[in-house]
Amino acid sequence: MPLVDPVTMSTPSTPAKAMGKSLPNTVKDPSPPPKAGSHTRSPVESPSNSYYIAASIPALQLQIFVLLWKRLVDDPVATMSRLILPVMALIQVFYAVVLLPVAGSGKQWRKPRPGEKKKAQGGEPNIALATLLSLLLTLIATPPIHALMVLFGAPFLTHAPHTFLCALNLSLLTLFPLFYTRGAEASAWRALAGFTAPIDESVGGLVGACFGAWLGAVPIPLDWDRDWQRWPVTVLTGIYVGYAIGSYGGRTLLRIRGYSAKRS
């Protein structure tokens, strides 16, 4: 029997080991894995895209109103109830849900003190519920706005549907975004009523629409005998024009304040 040197004898190598030595090391991805429940940001949610989309909303609403202005002069009630209000409601809901922060989304939760039991913290606000609640509050706020218009000289008995629909337009444009972003927080509404709230597009739109409604009532008593002088064509026109101007003015002030904060 031949002798075999144990030193020179080669051990059989498996194919897996041979392939493992020949293959280069795999480079691992340094980026952390996505968290559970996270989603890819859509193009609309991009900060640059969302700014331009939000900036185009008042201009779009004003263009739609201009296209429907002739019909508004001919039949104010039918045009407001069947065309203007449904279209504006859809635009406002899209604007709020996609581009505005819902009330409570940026709330900072307080850490429990030593010995204090940790309270159950709710998750993110329910956007669908917040939208429905904001629409309901918008509808509830319409009768008080109607009453204010009557106090400022709107017809009391003869044009009640006209006044109510005009008040609903004003409430939908100005109060719905505020209800959606501020919710029922008393401090936020006190700051808004006391003119101490920071100026943004929603506050600017509110101020501009109210001033536009007041300015739009000026041509009504003039003796020009024009169809567009009928209630509430000029007032509603002033609301939409003032809302667009105020919204862009508030947006500009907000950007200037943010730019100044970055520089400081």
UniProtKB/Swiss-Prot annotation:
Which compartment or compartments is the protein found in? Endoplasmic reticulum membrane
The primary site where this protein sits is endoplasmic reticulum
Spell out where the chain crosses the membrane. Answer: 49-69, 83-103, 132-152, 160-180, 202-222, 233-253
What keywords are assigned to this protein?
A: Endoplasmic reticulum, GPI-anchor biosynthesis, Membrane, Transmembrane, Transmembrane helix
The pathway where this protein functions is:
Glycolipid biosynthesis; glycosylphosphatidylinositol-anchor biosynthesis
The UniProt annotation puts the region (Disordered) at 1-45
Q: Name one GO biological process term.
A: GPI anchor biosynthetic process
Entry keyword annotation includes Secreted: no
Membrane topology designation: Multi-pass membrane protein
Offer a single GO CC term for the protein: endoplasmic reticulum membrane
Which InterPro entries has this protein been placed in? GPI_biosynthesis_protein_Pig-F
Its annotated function is as follows: Acts in the GPI biosynthetic pathway between GlcNAc-PI synthesis and GPI transfer to protein.
In the record, the note on similarity to other proteins reads:
Belongs to the PIGF family.
UniProt protein name:
Glycosylphosphatidylinositol anchor biosynthesis protein 11
Organism encoding this protein: Pyricularia oryzae (strain 70-15 / ATCC MYA-4617 / FGSC 8958)
